[in-house]
Amino acid sequence: MATDSRTSWLLTVSLLCLLWPQEASAFPAMPLSSLFSNAVLRAQHLHQLAADTYKEFERAYIPEGQRYSIQNAQAAFCFSETIPAPTGKEEAQQRTDMELLRFSLLLIQSWLGPVQFLSRIFTNSLMFGTSDRVYEKLKDLEEGIQALMQELEDGSPRVGQILKQTYDKFDANMRSDDALLKNYGLLSCFKKDLHKAETYLRVMKCRRFVESSCAF
């Protein structure tokens, strides 16, 4: 793949990382509306980061003629497709806030291990030279969700057995077609799962605070 395509990829992801909200790791005592706003903002940013990373990886490594057939096979690859989580806004509206928070926590925690291997793939990236920053963003969102669960339950968040599930690590052998397809699938799942977490948080914020924007 041409060097300029990969350079565009690195710059896109690096810029998104720089735009991460300041003091992202801080979730001090604050009103419930602020806890929701902060969590939604972080989920939106992570989802955008995941979507743009997937798109640029696709441009750099996946031939256009193969993308459609590969994408059709990726749904079954995602661990999140095997759990009874809502698949969209309408289904999410039928669940309680605590159910949505637990599903959101599950989705975030399932990626905490795999993202630590991103640095083995994107060794020349300004942002992915180390995976620590992506990991920190996920940990920050995890803390925000746990803060919401504590606020709503008035106690420590409960984590069930389903939270033990996780994804495979990314494959560093970028010269292997199998590794490229595996990483492509993982990035697709990362994008889908972050979209779900963002949707759940926005549904909760919308129905709790009428002043919130519900057009999404």
Curated annotation (Swiss-Prot):
The GO annotation for biological process reads: cellular response to alkaline pH; cellular response to insulin stimulus; cellular response to thyroid hormone stimulus; female pregnancy; lung alveolus development; neuroblast proliferation; positive regulation of D-glucose transmembrane transport; positive regulation of multicellular organism growth
What is a single Pfam family found in this protein's UniProt entry? Hormone_1
Q: Where is the signal peptide?
A: 1-26
For this record, the Gene Ontology CC terms, alphabetical, are: extracellular region; extracellular space; nucleus; plasma membrane; secretory granule; trans-Golgi network
Location of Phosphoserine modifications: 131
Q: Which domain of life is it from?
A: Eukaryota
Molecular-function GO terms, alphabetical: growth hormone receptor binding; hormone activity; metal ion binding
CDD domains, alphabetized: somatotropin_like (cd10285)
Ordered alphabetically, the record's keywords are:
Disulfide bond, Hormone, Metal-binding, Phosphoprotein, Secreted, Signal, Zinc
The family this protein is said to belong to: Belongs to the somatotropin/prolactin family.
Function, as annotated: Plays an important role in growth control. Its major role in stimulating body growth is to stimulate the liver and other tissues to secrete IGF1. It stimulates both the differentiation and proliferation of myoblasts. It also stimulates amino acid uptake and protein synthesis in muscle and other tissues.
Q: What is this protein called?
A: Somatotropin
Source organism of the structure:
Mus musculus
